[in-house]
Amino acid sequence: MNKTYLAPTKNYSTWYIIDAKNKNLGRLSSKIAKLLRGKNSISFTPYVNNKIYIILINSRSINVTGKKFVQKTYKRHSGYPGGLKVQKFNEILNQRPNRILEKSIKGMLPKGILGRQLFRQLKIYPDNIHPHESQQPKIITFI
């Protein structure tokens, strides 16, 4: 009887830093979601957390194509009658610049316990300043 091969778990974490300045929202989000998931690893296993941490800087200067900067809307509902809140992309970018990337990347991760663990490994900052220098992150540049 053959046994299923299980990839060995990592005991160390890998830190990456990504600059979001002038990058397209969707393209960057999908690449980050793939990295968090560990799909770039040769030992990818769907149910294993690969302990990859990503620091995303300059989220304030994310780019979108077309008229999405003024036309794209984000909706949330309180659950009460008349509780629908609608905000435009540029309003959210001015108030909470991290929220746009958080919402985009979280939607691309698995729904469940693993997805919540992976999302906690994403650190987003609106400017260049971040408190993770001691982790010595590797710089990743996307074209």
UniProtKB/Swiss-Prot annotation:
<keyword id="KW-0934">Plastid</keyword>
<protein>
    <recommendedName>
        <fullName>Large ribosomal subunit protein uL13c</fullName>
    </recommendedName>
</protein>
<comment type="subunit">
    <text>Part of the 50S ribosomal subunit.</text>
</comment>
<dbReference type="InterPro" id="IPR023563">
    <property type="entry name" value="Ribosomal_uL13_CS"/>
</dbReference>
<dbReference type="Pfam" id="PF00572">
    <property type="entry name" value="Ribosomal_L13"/>
</dbReference>
<dbReference type="GO" id="GO:0005840">
    <property type="term" value="C:ribosome"/>
</dbReference>
<dbReference type="GO" id="GO:0009507">
    <property type="term" value="C:chloroplast"/>
</dbReference>
<dbReference type="GO" id="GO:0003735">
    <property type="term" value="F:structural constituent of ribosome"/>
</dbReference>
<dbReference type="GO" id="GO:0006412">
    <property type="term" value="P:translation"/>
</dbReference>
<dbReference type="InterPro" id="IPR036899">
    <property type="entry name" value="Ribosomal_uL13_sf"/>
</dbReference>
<dbReference type="InterPro" id="IPR005822">
    <property type="entry name" value="Ribosomal_uL13"/>
</dbReference>
<keyword id="KW-0687">Ribonucleoprotein</keyword>
<dbReference type="GO" id="GO:0003729">
    <property type="term" value="F:mRNA binding"/>
</dbReference>
<comment type="similarity">
    <text>Belongs to the universal ribosomal protein uL13 family.</text>
</comment>
<keyword id="KW-0150">Chloroplast</keyword>
<dbReference type="GO" id="GO:0017148">
    <property type="term" value="P:negative regulation of translation"/>
</dbReference>
<keyword id="KW-0689">Ribosomal protein</keyword>
<dbReference type="InterPro" id="IPR005823">
    <property type="entry name" value="Ribosomal_uL13_bac-type"/>
</dbReference>
<dbReference type="GO" id="GO:1990904">
    <property type="term" value="C:ribonucleoprotein complex"/>
</dbReference>
